[in-house]
């Protein structure tokens, strides 16, 4: 794998990954991001087994396709210290080493075999939903009071998002042991 990418694009993607990855995991692969250079895009994936984050960077120059995983936090710390807006060259040196290079700086990072990275296959690319972020945030803020904080009842600590096609009967629901909140969606 060998590609060049803009520093800002890579930093933005890796900063989103920091909210998903596990820092103190018993599985080292969960602290890593999957980097996949294929076609005309770089696909960056992070997961903690409960949620998955996938970001595609289109403005990338790929010399050699491939994929690898490396520690997300270490890579993010390196990338954010590179000069903003400059090109970063990324290359797999071997199965367990990769190199980041920008201007006069070179860093070698340890990698883990990408086959070990846990990907949730079923229904992953099923459907895309677009919502106005401000309206969605308002709905989440209205709904969060009724989410249970009881760790013994983890099945009550989430929000159910229901979207139907065509009839505009979309809603969010949150429930705790004594509260129920249902709201129409901002579609």
Regions found by a protein language model. Give the residues of each.
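Positively charged, low-complexity/disordered segments
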Residues: 185-187
